[in-house]
Swiss-Prot record:
Similarity field: Belongs to the G-protein coupled receptor 1 family.
Stated name of the protein: Trace amine-associated receptor 7e
Any one GO MF annotation of this record: trace-amine receptor activity
Side of membrane Extracellular, spans: 1-47, 105-121, 188-212, 296-309
GO cellular component: plasma membrane
UniProt comment concerning the protein's domains: In addition to the well known disulfide bond common to G-protein coupled receptor 1 family, trace amine-associated receptors (TAARs) contain an unique disulfide bond (Cys-37-Cys-201) connecting the N-terminus to the extracellular Loop 2 (ECL2), which is required for agonist-induced receptor activation.
Glycosylation site residues: 34, 210
Keywords, ordered alphabetically: Cell membrane, Disulfide bond, G-protein coupled receptor, Glycoprotein, Membrane, Receptor, Transducer, Transmembrane, Transmembrane helix
TM region(s), chain numbering: 48-68, 84-104, 122-143, 167-187, 213-233, 275-295, 310-333
Main localization of the protein described in the UniProt heading: membrane
GO biological process, one term: G protein-coupled receptor signaling pathway
Length: 358
């Protein structure tokens, strides 16, 4: 029997409207809030892959840098001013893996921020703090390597534990004060009030930085970078000269003091090479992001979201790279990892273990 549409308590328009509202609500971060951000979710397959890739990087950053810190702090043979700088750098990378990457993973993959406005600012502040802390640490490490390679016999009297402590304090204090004051005073958003108002919604966590502060941020990255590049160019020139001198001396009978100096210089050159690779990896990871931030600020935020996310995660992955570099180039680190993983560091006097091959 045919039925008339008017006999139903709803019509087709109301059905379509309700279906449309249902579809829209499923694309909102918070379905029952009018000011909710709109989600742009991935399909299940890519979402699973992205969670796995980003999650693995966070776990690697935490576990790898924890191994670096444990190795340096536990084994007395590694207690040196230079290694304390490396341990502090590992701490910055560890904190990126703990306080930044997991939350950024959810925001990047799910398209929403579910952790509240308060932690949004903390998260952004941590992100900026640990980035600049790493830059300052690497800058001081490059200066340390220059002194060690240029004059290894006097190095220990110049770069003491006290000097290392001051470098570590400066790196952390300046980066934390700068990032938190910049974001919590609202200075970074001055002149962008209309943009911030348009972007503000429940479930969003976007950092808006005006042109002036983007330029200052870039300078804070560029100046230490130029210092590192200048210092390491000198380090490799000195290393090349020392290698040539050792080759000449090897053809003659060397005094015991000369032989000792050569051994020390060789060890310092290897350390400088490894840390030079660490610096290069950092620059390759972060430079694209900083260049894009300059382009965005002065050309009207033209970077597509997916490109921005790629650049951010390339930078984040740097926090997981340093332990891999150490493991590849440092036999002592591989030996320390083995002792830690097997639980042998719990044995009595394990801190006195010899990690360096004869």
């Amino acid at each position: 029997m045919a039925t008339d549409d008017a006999s139903f308590p709803w019509d087709q328009d109301s059905i379509l409207s309700r279906d449309l509202l249902s579809a829209l609500s499923s694309q909102l971060c918070y379905e029952n809030l009018n000011r909710s951000c709109i989600r742009s979710p991935y399909s299940p397959g890519p979402r699973l892959i992205l969670h796995a890739v980003f999650g693995f990087s966070a776990v690697l950053a935490v576990c790898g840098n924890l191994l670096v810190m444990t190795s340096i702090l536990h084994f007395r043979q590694l207690h040196s001013p230079a290694n304390f700088l490396v341990a502090s750098l590992a701490c910055a990378d560890l904190l990126v893996g703990l306080t930044v990457m997991p939350f950024s993973m959810v925001r990047s993959v799910e398209g929403c921020w579910y952790f509240g406005d308060i932690y949004c600012k903390f998260h952004s502040s941590f992100d900026v703090s640990f980035c600049y802390s790493s830059i300052f640490h690497l800058c001081f490490i490059s200066v340390d390597r220059y002194i060690a390679v240029s004059d290894p016999l006097i190095y220990l009297t110049r770069f003491t534990a006290s000097v290392s402590g001051k470098c570590i304090t400066f790196s952390w204090f300046l980066s934390i004060i700068y990032s938190f004051s910049l974001l919590y005073t609202g200075a970074s958003e001055a002149g962008l009030e209309d943009l911030v108002s348009a972007l503000t919604c429940v479930g969003g966590c976007q950092l808006a930085v005006n042109q002036s502060w983007v330029f200052i941020n870039f300078l804070l990255f560029l100046v230490p970078t130029l210092v590192m590049m200048t210092v390491y160019s000198k380090v490799f020139l000195i290393a090349k000269q020392q290698a040539q001198n050792i080759e000449k001396i090897g053809k003659q009978t060397a005094r015991a003091s000369e032989s000792y100096k050569d051994r020390v210089a060789k060890r310092e050159r290897k350390a400088a090479k490894t840390l030079g690779i660490t610096v290069a990896a950092f620059l390759l990871s972060w430079l694209p992001y900083f260049i894009d931030s300059i382009i965005d600020a002065f050309l009207g935020f033209i970077t597509p979201t997916y490109v921005y996310e790629i650049l951010v995660w390339i930078a984040y992955y740097n926090s997981a790279m340093n332990p891999l570099i150490y493991a590849f180039f440092y036999p002592w680190f591989r030996k320390a990892i083995k002792l830690i993983v097997t639980g042998k560091i719990l044995r009595e006097n394990s801190s006195a273990t010899n990690l360096f091959p004869e």
